[in-house]
């Protein structure tokens, strides 16, 4: 029986492989830790990060003690969408990074989807 970490890594690599086929668009990547949630817009062809937002940003950090919750994920999604809009990015590929599309990942994606298209 495989460990949970091994299953997660396999799921993450499978998702990244599928996303790498659409190289003409930038990637909205999500990372969750125990306390925080991070979102980055990455251009893989140039290997640069175009925009980033997380619960460590000063605007969002002030809101609550627990940072990795749905309310703050919505704020991170709105912030990354605002930064993408100012950078002129309208179309991205959503990289959920091996996480289930549920809870904070879904909340962040729905909030970002209001200004960016995936």
Curated annotation (Swiss-Prot):
InterPro entries on file: Ribosomal_uL18_bac-type (IPR004389), Ribosomal_uL18_bac/euk (IPR005484)
Alphabetical keyword list: Ribonucleoprotein, Ribosomal protein, RNA-binding, rRNA-binding
Chaperone keyword on record: no
Origin: domain of life: Bacteria
Molecular function terms, GO-annotated: 5S rRNA binding; structural constituent of ribosome
GO biological process: translation
Annotated GO CC locations: cytosolic large ribosomal subunit
Keyword Amino-acid biosynthesis among record annotations: no
Family: Belongs to the universal ribosomal protein uL18 family.
Role of this protein: This is one of the proteins that bind and probably mediate the attachment of the 5S RNA into the large ribosomal subunit, where it forms part of the central protuberance.
PANTHER family associated with the record: 39S RIBOSOMAL PROTEIN L18, MITOCHONDRIAL, LARGE RIBOSOMAL SUBUNIT PROTEIN UL18M
Quaternary structure annotation from Swiss-Prot or TrEMBL: Part of the 50S ribosomal subunit; part of the 5S rRNA/L5/L18/L25 subcomplex. Contacts the 5S and 23S rRNAs.
Protein name in UniProt: Large ribosomal subunit protein uL18
Phylogenetic placement of the source organism: Bacteria, Pseudomonadati, Pseudomonadota, Alphaproteobacteria, Rickettsiales
Gene name tied to this protein: rplR
């Amino acid at each position: 029986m495989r460990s949970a970490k091994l299953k997660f890594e396999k799921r993450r690599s499978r998702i990244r492989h599928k996303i790498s086929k659409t190289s003409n668009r930038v990637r909205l990547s999500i990372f969750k830790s125990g306390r925080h949630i991070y979102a980055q817009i990455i251009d893989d062809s140039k290997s640069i990060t175009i925009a980033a937002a997380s619960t460590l940003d000063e605007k969002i950090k002030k809101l609550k003690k627990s940072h990795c919750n749905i309310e703050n994920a919505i704020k991170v999604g709105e912030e990354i969408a605002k930064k993408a809009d100012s950078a002129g990015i309208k179309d991205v590929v959503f990289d959920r990074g091996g996480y289930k599309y549920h809870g904070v990942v879904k909340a962040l994606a729905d909030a970002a989807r209001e200004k960016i298209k995936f």
